[in-house]
From Swiss-Prot:
Pfam families to which the protein is assigned, alphabetical: CN_hydrolase (PF00795)
Organism: Synechocystis sp. (strain ATCC 27184 / PCC 6803 / Kazusa)
Protein name: Deaminated glutathione amidase
Cystine pairings recorded for this chain: none
PROSITE patterns, sorted: CN_HYDROLASE, UPF0012
Family the entry assigns: Belongs to the carbon-nitrogen hydrolase superfamily. NIT1/NIT2 family.
Length: 272
């Protein structure tokens, strides 16, 4: 692992696949021009509409998204963490996986994860979200991809961040960097987003790269923004605020080693 710049992109995706991919391309280009070697895209970057719309277009979204990610990685010679996007479930009409993927600069897929924790909640602002109505939960733990260049990358998606046992599993598999792409609601995000990300970073002494959605996507769907990169001590290295853009910061193996030596909590676990 070497020091490198990572970027967490922040988008306002809408129910328009073509426009969303165009926005994503512009932000990837911006990140690469600023020196990023690892670029993260938020949950629902390719399409953010209601669940019925998303399911009706799931095959088209998945096909276009996979081609787009391969093309972007090759064109910009950058590693891309992307998720999630809908991927149809074979033999299950009316269901798709919420999928994250890791793409190498040559366009090869290095890792894939289907979100296991589905967002079925009644938010106090009056909105109800029932992800399981159209999304099939993944059945496997998320992967940790072991990279000589970028460290060990652990995948997750949005609502997963509320389940610390998932990230403890990733840390036990050697994760150095935790990927948390999200479309956090505006209501929950203002109180929970930053706290949860810092907690996952601190308790696992890992970097966190958290791309995000922001703003108004369609009627009654507003997201929090604040894409972030956080160091293993819980320090916020970059915050994209509330407008589309990016958070960019250095991932440094010396800092990772320093924190783990100064606060060796992973070595002190009793209940493992």
């Amino acid at each position: 692992m070497k020091p490198y710049l990572a970027a967490a992109l922040q988008m306002t995706s809408r129910p328009n696949l073509t426009e969303n991919l165009q926005e994503a391309e512009e932000l990837i280009d911006l990140a690469v021009r600023q020196g990023a070697e690892l670029v993260g895209l938020p949950e629902n970057f390719a399409f953010l509409g209601n669940e019925t719309e998303k399911l009706e277009q799931a095959t088209a979204i998945a096909t276009a998204t996979e081609k787009f990610l391969q093309t972007m990685a090759q064109r910009f010679q950058v590693t891309i963490l992307a998720g999630g996007f809908p991927f149809p479930v074979a033999g299950e009409a009316g269901k798709a996986y919420n999928t994250a993927t890791l793409i190498a600069p040559n366009g090869q897929e290095l890792a894939r994860y289907h979100k296991v924790h589905l967002f079925d909640v009644n938010v106090p602002d009056g909105n109800t979200y029932w992800e399981s109505a159209t999304v099939m939960a993944g059945q496997k733990y998320p992967p940790v991809y072991h990279s000589d260049s970028f460290g060990n990358l652990g995948l997750s998606i949005c609502y997963d961040v509320r389940f610390p046992e998932l990230y403890r599993y990733l840390s036990r598999q050697g994760a150095d960097v935790l990927f948390v792409p999200a479309a956090f609601t505006a209501y929950t995000g203002k109180d929970h987003w930053q706290v949860l990300l810092q907690a996952r970073a601190i308790e696992n002494t890992c970097y966190v790269i958290a791309p995000a959605q922001t703003g108004c996507h369609y009627e009654r769907r507003h997201t929090h923004g604040h894409a972030m990169i956080i160091d293993p001590w819980g320090v916020i290295l970059a915050d994209a605020g509330e407008k589309p853009g990016l958070a960019i910061a250095e991932i440094n193996p010396d800092r990772l080693k320093q924190v783990r030596q100064q606060m060796p909590s992973l070595q002190h676990r009793v209940f493992v």
